[in-house]
From Swiss-Prot:
ATP binds at residues 21-28. This is tRNA dimethylallyltransferase. Its EC number is 2.5.1.75. The gene is miaA. Pfam families: IPPT (PF01715). Residues 46-49, 171-175, 252-257 are annotated as: Interaction with substrate tRNA. SUPFAM superfamilies: P-loop containing nucleoside triphosphate hydrolases. The keyword Membrane does not apply. It comes from Buchnera aphidicola subsp. Baizongia pistaciae (strain Bp). Keywords: ATP-binding, Magnesium, Nucleotide-binding, Transferase, tRNA processing. Its cofactor is Mg(2+).
Length: 323
């Protein structure tokens, strides 16, 4: 039975629902279950699910699930392509407007916290243009020192940007440092638009684990299941294409990078498993750090039953729908 919301024209602002949380907390299952009973459309907010042919290692909903529960922003890029934060912001605004136009509510589900934050803060502000002298200085540092030196500089100046930029993504590290040296403000500071008022009534939920230990154990079990379901073969097909490399954003996804190193004989099979689990746990810690500092968040427990979770979500939405 579909639970009806009040008429949309009565809302002061159109409704948008966030369902966030660390990896392996069953966000997708909850979102798909909600779609059975609420007038919603699902939108993926996951920087890994955008890639075609990367299904097992990203824990993407199955083809059958996607057929029954379509998700916007899933399978929209080839692994050779990139997808910037700016592109996401433009796409998500169009998608939200479309969903509202068909009298549905967008439910944004995923674990890429920076994408959620961008929607709350109004996108990326105008960043300073590149400065040739500063860029030359940074390139000289890169040549004389190393990419690790530059990344550590970024970590000390702008730890939030360092959390979301991989140290191998040298161009983005350089750009973040360049922005700071030109403007005197970090990329994170410049991305927070002052006095931005969202045009949406955003109700935010996070699905949180009962403990880190519980989640880490689940991550281990899940990765072993991925291996048994053909994850190695999935990455091997990408590896054999010949046009992909490990510094692409797609191949830097957790698990794919480590399996790539295994194929390049940089890791043993056992080390690949160990490093994949370590990388996943680092990702989880980063996600939890974001969420622990998040404002106006309705926290749900992943150990709760689906029935109870749905009841709580509907109750919170009804309480906030005319705010």
């Amino acid at each position: 039975m579909i639970v009806k919301f009040e008429k949309f024209e009565k809302l002061k602002k159109p409704l948008v629902i966030f369902l966030m949380g660390p990896t392996a907390c069953n966000k997708s299952l909850l979102a798909m279950t909600l779609k059975d009973i609420l007038p919603i459309e699902l939108v993926s907010v996951d920087s890994a699910l955008i890639y075609r042919g990367m299904d097992i290692g990203t824990a993407k909903p199955s083809n059958m699930e996607l057929l029954k529960y379509p998700h916007f922003l899933v399978n929209i890029r080839d692994p050779l392509q990139t997808y910037s934060v700016g592109e996401f912001y433009k796409d998500i605004l169009k998608i939200i407007d479309y969903i509202h136009s068909i009298n549905k509510v967008p439910l944004l589900v995923g674990g890429t916290m920076f994408y959620f934050k961008i929607l709350l803060t109004g996108g990326l502000s105008n960043l300073p243009s590149s400065n040739d002298n500063i860029r030359k200085y940074l390139l000289t540092l890169l040549q004389k020192k190393s990419k690790f030196f530059l990344f550590n500089q970024l970590k000390s100046i702008d730890p939030i940007s360092a959390e979301r930029i991989h140290f191998n993504d040298v161009q983005r590290v350089l750009r973040a440092l360049e922005v700071f040296f030109i403007s005197g403000k970090t990329l994170t500071e410049l991305c927070r638009l002052k006095n931005f008022v969202s045009p949406y009534n955003i109700v935010q939920f996070s699905l949180m684990p009962e403990s880190k230990e519980w989640l880490f154990n689940k991550i281990t079990i899940r990765f072993k299941k991925m291996l048994s379901c053909g994850f190695e073969y999935e990455v091997k097909k990408l590896f054999n294409r010949g046009d992909l490399h490990k510094n692409l954003p797609s191949i830097r996804c957790v698990g794919y990078r480590q399996m790539w190193d295994y194929f390049m004989h940089n890791l043993t099979y056992d080390d690949m498993i160990c490093e994949s689990l370590k990388a996943t746990k680092r990702l989880v810690k980063s996600q939890l750090t974001w969420l622990n500092n998040w404002k106006k968040l309705n926290v749900l427990s992943s150990s709760d039953t689906l029935k109870n979770l749905i009841t709580k979500i509907i109750s919170v939405i009804n309480a906030n729908i005319f705010v």
